[in-house]
Amino acid sequence: MAIFDTDIFIWIQRGNSKAARLIENTAERYLSIQTFMELLQGAASKDQHKYTKSFIKDFNFIVLPLTENIGHRALIYVEEYSLSHGIRAGDAIIAATAVENNLPLSTSNKKHFKAVRDLNLKVFKP
């Protein structure tokens, strides 16, 4: 069981078999609505939109919505860590989604999240 950061999907799109196995070997798969939006925003065509949506559906990802609690926690993370560690709003939302849902976050971007002490970080090494 894990929530996946956007970078894991990017590794898969680049053909990284370790990232693909990570997804395949995780029984319960989650992603933040923020990650879903980032994936769609990064698409270069409607076909890539379709592919992304199909991938999410075919692998039974549960897309976790932005709730009031997640928004509040993300705001705290931005206030606490944006100046000292450079955390950006999108990463704060993803981290807050993981913490609020008591899920480990799988990412290869350790530096984006290392400041968030209450986050269970699972670092992926491509």
Give, region by region, the residue ranges found by the protein language model:
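Generic structural signal for small/hydrophobic residues in well-ordered secondary structure
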Residues: D5-T6, L39, A74, A98, ...
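Short, well-structured N-terminal submotif of metal-dependent ribonuclease cores
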Residues: M1-L31, Q41-S54
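Short loop->beta-strand "edge-of-pocket" segments that line small-molecule binding or catalytic clefts
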Residues: A2, E28-Y30, F59-V63, P104
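Acidic, PIN/NYN-like endoribonuclease modules and their adjacent C-terminal/linker elements
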Residues: M1, A95, N101-P126
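Active-site neighborhoods of divalent-metal-dependent phosphate/nucleic-acid chemistry enzymes
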Residues: I62-S108
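Histidine- and aromatic-rich ligand-binding microenvironments
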Residues: F4-D7, S32, G86-R88, N109-K110, ...
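Alpha-helix capping/helix-boundary segments
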Residues: I8, T35, I70, I93-I94, ...
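Nucleotide phosphate-binding site architecture
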Residues: F9-I10, M37-L40, K114, K122
